[in-house]
């Protein structure tokens, strides 16, 4: 009985590990709206980064999302302004912190960012 249980747990653990070991999706598998959202989040992280390494990595990530986007550069310039303004907004919680990463996630998912995407996607379609 013990051997059977151990064998079953081993198979389960191996299966779980194999599922976690799947490669990440390619940027090309991500939708255009989500590419813009991810760019916004990466650019926001550039603004809040307190280390040169994180800032450089976030800039490189933003560049990758920008290269994969079909939106005009003006969309990204407008989004930078939205990010700068939204970062001034206070976000509260139970911990005594600035919630900077949370702000970036919320900014990326905000109605303002979604509206920018829609505006520039419509212009591109015309």
Model-assigned labels for residue ranges:
Residues 22-68:
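N-terminal secretory signal peptides
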Residues 16-21:
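Sec/Tat signal peptide C-region and signal peptidase I cleavage site
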Residues 15, 36-38, 98:
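Processing junctions and N-termini across compartments
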Residues 1-9:
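Bacterial N-terminal signal peptides that target proteins for export
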Residues 54-126:
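Compact alpha-helical subdomains of small soluble proteins
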Residues 3, 24-28, 90-94:
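Low-complexity, polar-biased intrinsically disordered regions enriched in Pro/Ser/Thr/Gly
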């Amino acid at each position: 009985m013990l051997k059977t249980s151990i064998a079953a747990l081993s198979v389960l653990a191996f299966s779980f590990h194999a599922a976690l070991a799947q490669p990440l999706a390619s940027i090309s598998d991500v939708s255009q709206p989500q590419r813009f959202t991810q760019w916004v989040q990466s650019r926001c992280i550039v603004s809040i980064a307190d280390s040169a390494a994180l800032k450089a990595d976030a800039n490189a990530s933003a560049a990758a999302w920008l290269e994969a986007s079909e939106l005009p550069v003006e969309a990204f310039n407008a989004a930078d302004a939205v990010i700068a303004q939204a970062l001034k907004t206070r976000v509260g919680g139970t911990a005594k912190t600035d919630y900077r990463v949370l702000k970036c996630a919320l900014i990326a998912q905000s109605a303002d960012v979604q509206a920018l995407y829609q505006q520039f996607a419509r212009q591109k379609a015309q």
